[in-house]
C-alpha cells in the first residue's frame, strides 16, 4: 500500500492565514467539492469556551477566501467540524454539540448540503456521549470511529448505509489508554487503516488495520504521541498523516505512515506552535493542501499551507 523504499522529501511552498476574525479560530477540516475549496472550523472566545460556532469558508483558487456560512445552535458549543464526501453527491458535515456548564455532555450532529453554502438542519447521529470523530465511505457504506467522552473510555466503530443512521459495527474497537481522536482511510483493495490518538498510559498512537467486513482489527503501537490525527492516501499509495507532535517543540506536522513496519515518520513541520493541530488534508494538482490552526503568531488563527512532495 505504500512505497517505503522511496525516499520522500517535502517542502512548504506557501502558507496563508485564512481564518482570523474570531478571538479563537481552530479545529479545521478541508475538502474540495463541486470544483471549489471549503474549509470548516470553530470560532469562539477560547479553546474551551461554550460559545463555539462553525464557520465554513470557500474559495475557487485556495488563495482568496469568503464566508459560505456560519452554523450555530443556541446554548450549544459546536466543536471540531469534519467533512464527509458522500457518494450521492451531497456534502456532509459532522461535529460535536457540547452542552452543560459544569459537566459537559457531547452529542454528534450532522448537516447535509448540495452546494456547501446552504446546510439543512442538524440531525443527531450515533449515541450520546460517544463522539464520532471522522467518517469515510467505502463500498456503499459509511464507517466512523467514535470515542467515549466519559468513563469507561473506549473507541467504537460505526457503520451506516445512509450516513445518518449509525449502527454499532465494532462496539469495542480499542479500550486501553483513553483512545479518542482518529483518522480513517480505505485502500483500493478494501483494507481499512485507522490512526488512533491515546491520552493515558504510554499515550502512544495506535495504527489499526482490518479487511472487509471490518469486524476484526489488528493494532500496532507506533511509539509516538500524536494529537488531531487525520490520514490521506495519495494516488501512488503513500499514506500521509497530519498530526500534532509533542517531542521537542509542539508543532503541526505532516508524517509518512508505513503500515507494514508500524512507523510514523515526520516529513515536514508546518509553521506552527503553541495551541496548534487539527489539520485537514487534500491532494490536488500534485500538491498537498493542508488546513490547520496555530497560535505561533499570537492569536489562534486558521492557516492554509501548500506542500510539495518529491521522491
Give the residues covered by each predicted segment.
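Beta-rich carbohydrate-recognition and catalytic domains
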Residues: 1-23, 31-78, 85-274, 283-311
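C-terminal structured domain segments
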Residues: 278-280
Amino acid at each position: 500500500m505504500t512505497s517505503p523504499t522511496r525516499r520522500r522529501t517535502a517542502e512548504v511552498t506557501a502558507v496563508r492565514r485564512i481564518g482570523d476574525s474570531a478571538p479563537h479560530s481552530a479545529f479545521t477540516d478541508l475538502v474540495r467539492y463541486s470544483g471549489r475549496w471549503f474549509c470548516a472550523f470553530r470560532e469562539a472566545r477560547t479553546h474551551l469556551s461554550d460559545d463555539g460556532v462553525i464557520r465554513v469558508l470557500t474559495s475557487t483558487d485556495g488563495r482568496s477566501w469568503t464566508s459560505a456560512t456560519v452554523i450555530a445552535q443556541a446554548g450549544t458549543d459546536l466543536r471540531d467540524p469534519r467533512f464527509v464526501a458522500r457518494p450521492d453527491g451531497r456534502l456532509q458535515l459532522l461535529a460535536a454539540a457540547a452542552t452543560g456548564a459544569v459537566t459537559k455532555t457531547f452529542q454528534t450532529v450532522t448537516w447535509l448540503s448540495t452546494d456547501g453554502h446552504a446546510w439543512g438542519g442538524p440531525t443527531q447521529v450515533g449515541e450520546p456521549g460517544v463522539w464520532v470523530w471522522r467518517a469515510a465511505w467505502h463500498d456503499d457504506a459509511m464507517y466512523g470511529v467514535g470515542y467515549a467522552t466519559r468513563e469507561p473510555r473506549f473507541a467504537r466503530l460505526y457503520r451506516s448505509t445512509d450516513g445518518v443512521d449509525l449502527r454499532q459495527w465494532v462496539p469495542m474497537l480499542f479500550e486501553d489508554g483513553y483512545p479518542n481522536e482518529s483518522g480513517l482511510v480505505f485502500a483500493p483493495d478494501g483494507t481499512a487503516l485507522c490512526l488512533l490518538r491515546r491520552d493515558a498510559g504510554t499515550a502512544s498512537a495506535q495504527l489499526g488495520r482490518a479487511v472487509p467486513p471490518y469486524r476484526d482489527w489488528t493494532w500496532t503501537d507506533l511509539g509516538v504521541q500524536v494529537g488531531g490525527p487525520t490520514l490521506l492516501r495519495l494516488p501512488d499509495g503513500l499514506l500521509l498523516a497530519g498530526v500534532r507532535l509533542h517531542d521537542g517543540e509542539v508543532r503541526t506536522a505532516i508524517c509518512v505512515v508505513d503500515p507494514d513496519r508500524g512507523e510514523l515518520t515526520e516529513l515536514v513541520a508546518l509553521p506552527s506552535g503553541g495551541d496548534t493541530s487539527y489539520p485537514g488534508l487534500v491532494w490536488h494538482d500534485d500538491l498537498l493542501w493542508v488546513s490547520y490552526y496555530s497560535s505561533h503568531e499570537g492569536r489562534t488563527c486558521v492557516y492554509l499551507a501548500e506542500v510539495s512532495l518529491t521522491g
